[in-house]
């Protein structure tokens, strides 16, 4: 019987994981170091592993699945089931070259991440950090200033996937006009009443810009000094996707100059380190990457990973294969 290797922990769907013992030998690497994991691989402890369940905490144990790690993975490995919508810590091209299929957890994260995006957007528009911190310091309103209403504002969404569309649905309830830019225009059914615009037009005409796209080599620092210069004065920036989509030093400069009115961020370029200029700026709403941290979403993510794993073993294909491999496996 082939094996499945769990890296990290399963918290909410432990029973479903254990039920897979009818079709797989279950092996676990619950904690340890990258060196421990590499040594285990080299010693042949995982030589019959067909599929890996990569939990959303696994990176702190093994580090990224880069070329070094891929080189020592067992030759029996055919599938990596990753728990997370973002998978920039997996060398997908390297996996493809080795014949390893990779899945992620889109859809399951859409609602929770969009909720946090709206929370950050409203918080940034109202510059809510100032009164929140003043109240806790016993200063009542402190240096609170007038905020901005969302009604009538243009929300520009960069990356109109599942999370972006849920963000749009919620923003429309606030009376916002929605425009977006994607690599390609959506179908009329998915687009709804949102307007498709060029990247430059999105930058130039949005009152709020929400980043909802994947991080890869072509999108790293997609928002930097040059892009800030093209934006409206007083724009609000929201990022719940990946921190490195934005050049954080350029964002700090844009905030200091007033080009950017405020920002709401859940992700950072060098997590868990946050650019000090962002920490020190009272115009910025900061959260510590909690976009999917609800009980319901975490359970749904774990179940989707397990469904991918079962499908891989029983059908030879996964449900939510990463887009880069759609025409490969």
Swiss-Prot record:
Cellular component annotations (GO), alphabetically ordered: cytosol
Catalytic center residues: 242, 271, 289
Biotech utility: Ethyl-2-hydroxy-4-methylpentanoate (ethyl leucate) contributes to a fruity flavor in Japanese sake and the strain overexpressing morA would help to ferment high-quality sake with an excellent flavor.
Annotated family: Belongs to the D-isomer specific 2-hydroxyacid dehydrogenase family.
The protein's name: 4-methyl-2-oxopentanoate reductase A
Signal peptide as annotated in the record: none
E.C. no: 1.1.1.272
Lineage start: Eukaryota, Fungi, Dikarya, Ascomycota, Pezizomycotina
Keywords: NAD, Oxidoreductase
